[in-house]
From Swiss-Prot:
Pfam family for this entry, one: Cytochrom_B_C
Subcellular location: Cellular thylakoid membrane
GO annotation, biological process: photosynthetic electron transport chain
Organism phylogeny: Bacteria, Bacillati, Cyanobacteriota, Cyanophyceae, Synechococcales
Gene: petD
TM helices/strands, residue ranges: 36-56, 95-115, 131-151
GO function terms (MF aspect): electron transporter, transferring electrons within cytochrome b6/f complex of photosystem II activity; electron transporter, transferring electrons within the cyclic electron transport pathway of photosynthesis activity; ubiquinol-cytochrome-c reductase activity
Protein name: Cytochrome b6-f complex subunit 4
Length: 160
């Protein structure tokens, strides 16, 4: 098995695109040993050094002690669960909310099969995958921002 990814040059459509100058004539350098031995350890050690430096220079506070007698008006989950919380909050039927959330991983699993005819890795040459990614990112940000707002403003984000 080769370390380099090589395209199927017997495909006539791909050969026509390569003849027009579309595609890559150079397929990169091998991952072993260039990336795995030299670049990854530098990036990992640099990340650890940055995190250690930030932790030493500005330690995070634990927070204020919990008061069991002061309940907030609206309880919110952690920030990374805001989009999921917003789906459950705005969908009228809770079973439909669960079904919608189970469709997200199924849709992500289906993307490679939908886009399997495309032999390019460049995102600008993969319009379906790029469109799904951009739509999912914008929609997730929309749901996350809406979850932080009160329920009457969460669908419109308070804009109208």
């Amino acid at each position: 098995m080769s370390i380099l990814k090589k395209p199927d040059l017997s495909d006539p459509i791909l050969r026509q695109k390569l003849a027009k100058g579309m595609g890559h004539n150079y397929y990169g350098e091998p991952a072993w040993p260039n990336d795995l031995l030299y670049m990854f350890p530098v990036v990992i050690l640099g990340t650890i050094a940055c995190l250690t430096g930030l932790a030493v220079l500005d330690p995070a506070l634990v927070g204020e002690p919990a008061d069991p007698f002061a309940t907030p008006l609206e309880i919110l989950p952690e920030w990374y669960l805001y989009p999921v919380f917003q789906i459950l909050r705005i969908v009228p039927n809770k079973l439909l909310g669960i079904v919608l959330q189970s469709m997200i991983p199924l849709g992500l699993i289906a993307i490679p099969f939908i886009e399997s005819v495309n032999k390019f890795q460049n995102p600008f040459r993969r319009p379906i995958a790029t469109a799904v990614f951009l739509f999912g990112t914008v929609f997730t940000l929309y749901l996350g921002i809406g979850a932080a707002l009160p329920i009457d403003k969460s669908l419109t984000l308070g804009l109208f």
